[in-house]
Regions:
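Cytochrome P450
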Residues: 1-392
């Protein structure tokens, strides 16, 4: 690759991520791995550096402006530092224990089977609309204790608010209305759970808030929103993007179909390949130096997971989709104290959907042989918007 000087770019450019960000990110990673963009925002693009920063959460703070650039920290664990972060995480983790996931497995498999059966019976479907979107929405809706009749509006609120998460300048009337409607809705739910607690996660959060955990109603609202948005967007995009990669590389799908062990490795490669959360931002609480580059106190520093998951120092042929890749030290779920709590649920959903799809089909192909994916116009998440396929 030619070592030409890249014109300074906006590391949060939506157009770049919607199109093909990888040539630009590769140049940055190879030439200026600790990169300051045209707006003065820093970016870490290598796994070693991101792990270092994430382990030093007291220096690379999440609670100053929150997890999004130029933002305002919200009352949720993702936008908090210890000890508040640890207190909130301890409570939310009650919904994601190994015992909880083991108990939940049969139900997740049943939901996946129902969705796949309906799609395969028609001989064709849009993976996003018919499988990848409804699976996590159903499961997250249940965890929130929401009736099925509310799933569509919860989905709309989630999609709208994630669209405004890139930067405050993208907060439109639709985003504001969605936030207001969600806040009104979840506030009513919280009041109900105070009187009628159940087994759902909102009830667990409410009980913890009343038991002096350091949380209050605002933290319940914020963490329920985190569950809704995070649980929806990430799994949907990996189901879709992983399957798109396997269809485009049929020899890789053949390997993934062979055994449960092969599928597990394939899932990890799908996570690396898609990297559904592009980045998180931290703010430095003191002057720091990485790779000889000095980053001043008070700087916004992007953890660019999308760039890091193609790191040449960590992956052989990083731009090749290889379901046999092992080990696969990706950071699709982040790293350190803010490692995604829902990782085990996401893997369970991916395993369930792919298992059912492979079990019920001989082939999965693009409905249109000339299909090319259209990605979300965003710099926080990156996902395929529609994936029409046909089955045999």
């Amino acid at each position: 690759m030619a070592k030409v000087q890249l014109v300074k770019v906006n590391i949060l450019d939506r157009d770049m991520y919607q199109n093909d960000p990888f040539p630009t990110l590769e140049w940055i990673r190879l030439n200026e791995p600790v990169y300051q963009d045209v707006n003065g925002i820093w970016a870490l693009t290598k796994i070693e550096d991101i792990r270092l920063a994430e382990r030093q959460a007291q220096i690379f703070a999440s609670g100053i402006i929150g997890s999004r650039p130029n933002g305002v920290a919200q009352p949720s664990m993702i936008d908090s530092d210890d000890p508040s972060h640890a207190d909130q995480r301890r409570v939310v983790a009650r919904g994601f224990t190994p015992r909880q996931m083991a108990a939940y497995q049969t139900h997740v498999e049943e939901v996946a089977r129902r969705l796949v059966d309906a799609a395969v019976a028609r001989g064709a479907c849009d993976i996003v609309a018919d499988i990848a979107r409804p699976l996590p929405m159903t499961l997250i809706g249940e965890m929130l204790g929401a009736p099925e009749s509310d799933y569509d509006k919860l989905q709309h609120w989630s999609d709208a608010m994630i669209n405004g998460a890139d930067d405050p300048k993208y907060v439109t009337d639709d985003v504001i209305n969605a936030a207001f409607e969600y806040y009104t809705y979840i506030s009513v739910v919280i009041e109900d759970r105070k009187k009628n607690p159940g087994d759902d996660l909102v009830s667990k959060l409410v009980v913890a808030a009343e038991d002096g955990s350091g949380m209050d109603d605002e933290h319940v609202v914020g963490n329920a929103l985190l569950l809704l948005v995070g649980g929806n967007e990430t799994t949907r995009n990996v189901i879709t993007g992983g399957l798109e990669a396997m269809i485009r590389n049929p020899e890789q799908m053949t390997i993934a179909r062979r055994s449960p062990e092969d599928l597990e490795r394939a899932i990890e490669e799908c996570l690396r390949w898609v990297t559904p959360i592009v980045n998180m931002v931290r703010v430095t609480t003191e002057d720091v130096e990485i790779r000889g580059v000095k980053i001043p106190k008070g700087s916004q520093v992007i953890m660019n997971y999308t760039a890091a998951n193609r790191d040449e120092d960590m992956f052989v042929e990083p731009h090749t989709f290889d379901v046999t890749r092992s080990p696969n030290p990706h950071i699709a779920f982040g790293w350190g104290p803010h490692l995604c709590l829902g990782a085990s649920l996401a893997r369970l959903e991916l395993r369930s959907i792919y298992t059912e799809l492979f079990k019920r089909t001989n082939t999965i192909e693009f409905a249109d042989p000339n299909y090319q994916p259209v990605y979300s116009h965003a710099s926080f998440v990156r996902g395929i918007q529609s994936l029409p396929v046909k089955f045999s």
